[in-house]
């Protein structure tokens, strides 16, 4: 008998090679034995392994798409839309500091984007078994602990802040909402390509420096959480780096709010 773990790509590959070799050997011996015959269960993958494998491949990519779509629907309207309507001038003449205005914009847009992303995430979690054509007992979201969900929520939250910050800065350069949408397209392509990396390779990388790369760190952080292979220091690096990028983007946006050439063009 050949036992293997279908949730492990290396184990599955070795099983396929050995089964092929033994099948050929069996044929040369006039069918003296059969590989994995009978009703015994030879797949050693647990429900946790199966759930982790499928969720880690699909959900990081879907989450990034949902989060980006949610942020893209509101950020251009909030920045470029107000420039187009001329209402941004009312905000800029208030005694509020530009940095506070920029951070307020990012946080408020981030909350809306987060709610949009979470609603899409919950719907996807509930429908994924049917979408994958998998029996309901093969995947179970209850295999994840409260800690896993908290870490996932923190990664999602900081990712939304970075996304909103980047989209807000891009939108500030645009004169209209339509122009902002066109300028955002290259960033959308980059995020989509990065999101696909969750379906490639054999899990999240172990080296912490990968978790300093914007957007890629979030995808791999979510991948590690879903397949139970995450390291605490890597998740911390992901969260801290995202907060740093958010701070940098808010400072850039504040500088742009202080530029009449940009805001009144």
Residue locations for each model-derived region?
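Junction motif at the cytosolic side of a transmembrane helix
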Residues: 78, 169-175, 226, 242-265
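Transmembrane helix boundary and interhelical loop/hinge segments in multi-pass membrane proteins
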Residues: 72-94
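Short helix-loop junctions at transmembrane helix boundaries
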Residues: 117-151, 164, 172-177, 220-229
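A structural motif at transmembrane helix-loop-helix junctions in multipass membrane proteins
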Residues: 78, 84, 147-189
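Selective transmembrane-helix segments that form parts of the transport pathway or gating/packing helices
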Residues: 98-128, 239, 243
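Hydrophobic/aromatic residues in alpha-helical transmembrane segments
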Residues: 71-75, 123, 165-166, 249, ...
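Transmembrane helix segments
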Residues: 177-212
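Transport-system extracytoplasmic interface segments
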Residues: 1-70
